[in-house]
Amino acid sequence: MPTLVYNCPSGISGDMNLGAMVALGVDPKALEAELRKLPYEAWHLHFDPDTRGGISGIRCSVHAHDHHGKHSSHGHGHHHRTFTDIQKTVKGSELSDRVKTDAIACFHALAVAEGSVH
């Protein structure tokens, strides 16, 4: 299996990560199908080419639907989940055991890094 190494001295958000994966050739439908294995309801993704500050890439917009079917783009006013919340969600998902293990390890590393700078 190929290994992807990130060098993000300024960090990377989840939507930036999804856009980068699509820009590298990951099929957006396959990506969304895997994410659908998580127990979250009423959302969809949009992937669009974008250029900012002379840097081109794929922008991922995450749209969460409310109970009336309306949607809004992901913004900074959202709820942040703790590592424990994420761990419970991943463990309770329909993802494969290997993906669960890898995802929890990645989020643990992220939690440790975030804890050291905040």
What residues fall within each predicted segment?
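Extreme N-terminal starter segment of soluble prokaryotic enzymes
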Residues: 1-4
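Glycine-rich nucleotide/cofactor/substrate-binding loop typically near the N-terminus or early
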Residues: 23-117
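Conserved phosphate/anionic-ligand binding catalytic regions in large, soluble enzymes, centered on
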Residues: 6-18
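A short alpha-helix capping/helix-coil boundary motif
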Residues: 12, 117-118
